[in-house]
Amino acid sequence: MNYSTDNTRIIDRRKVPAPYELVNKYPINDEISKLVYGTRNEISQILHNKDDRLFVVVGPCSIHDTESALEYAEKLALQNKKLNKNILIIMRVYFEKPRTTVGWKGLINDPDINETFNIAKGVELARKLLINIAELGLPAGTEFLDPISPQYVTDIISWGAIGARTAESQIHRELASGLSCPIGIKNGTDGGLKAAIDGIQAANHSHVFLGATKEADIAMLKTAGNNDTHIILRGGKEPNYDLESVNSTLTALREAEVNESIMIDASHGNSQKKFKQQIPVIESISDQILNGNDNIKGVMIESHLNEGNQKISESLKYGQSITDACMGWEDTVMCLEMLSDAIDKKRGK
């Protein structure tokens, strides 16, 4: 009798190029390096009260079509140039989707959206798209879901997020402590702050853990700790973007002796999954800024070329989300201008 005990539930295995292979195949030039380095520094300056602008991470819930993503980026790059005096715009470029149960997990996992799971194609598409976006002079931000995929793209990422479902994970806290960009950590799906604040404290410190290098070797990695970590309020059972919630969050951050910068996600629990409700969230944030709030440093908006969302099918509408519903382009411009005006008027007071 064969008593097999190893990998008994692995039913398929396909080799994926090592990160260094794609990094060498699609290298970044000095202009892109300068953009990423500079944007990371600008976000850090905002987080540490040395730059009075607001940074705004805005874009599709998830990337499923690189053509529409690039068209969106072209439009957003123009807004970034127009409004850069008051707000620093970073495109939301999410390639991986955490799922509560099951579902499409994103461009890297299943780029053809047909359950063929061509991850080798997915990581290549992701890197190429990020380079194309950066060539427009537009920085990119993403969510980090695992410790392997960042090795393919982090040199082109200016800001990153640890999501509500992974904020309590030791692996993700260790990852955040070693990532080269500022990192936002979301409050839990129930709206609680503890997981995010504990995550910030952990990510601030050095960690030693097993990880993979760009050469795909397993190695002991020691991190320096990341002082550019901050909380993201994404709501929960109830929204938490209002003044009372922001003030109670500030109190909790002070008591924990971590960075007091707050980013507000206008979508998810704060919009109660209704994409049009992002607009009143942005209005509230703008009012709080106008009334002197110095701790709201960042905003996140889910937006696409066309509003709403659609179910996955063989004939997808161009420029519309296949995951969470997003606001359309016209509303996006209105919200960006509203936030920019709030910063501008606050300076004039």
Predicted ranges, named:
Residues G59, I264, G328:
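Conserved, mostly hydrophobic/aromatic
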Residues P19-P27, T223-G235, L316:
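Gly-rich Lys/Arg/Thr-decorated short loops/hinges at beta-loop-alpha junctions or inter-strand turns
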Residues F55-S68, D324:
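Conserved phosphate/anionic-ligand binding catalytic regions in large, soluble enzymes, centered on
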Residues D6-L47:
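N- or domain-start disorder-to-order transition segments that initiate the globular core
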Residues N2-N7, N86-Y241, S245-V246, H268-G269, ...:
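Active-site-facing alpha/beta catalytic cores
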Residues H304-K345:
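Internal helix-turn-beta structural module
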Residues S44-D52, R254-V258:
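Glycine-rich phosphate/diphosphate-binding loops that line cofactor/substrate pockets in enzymes
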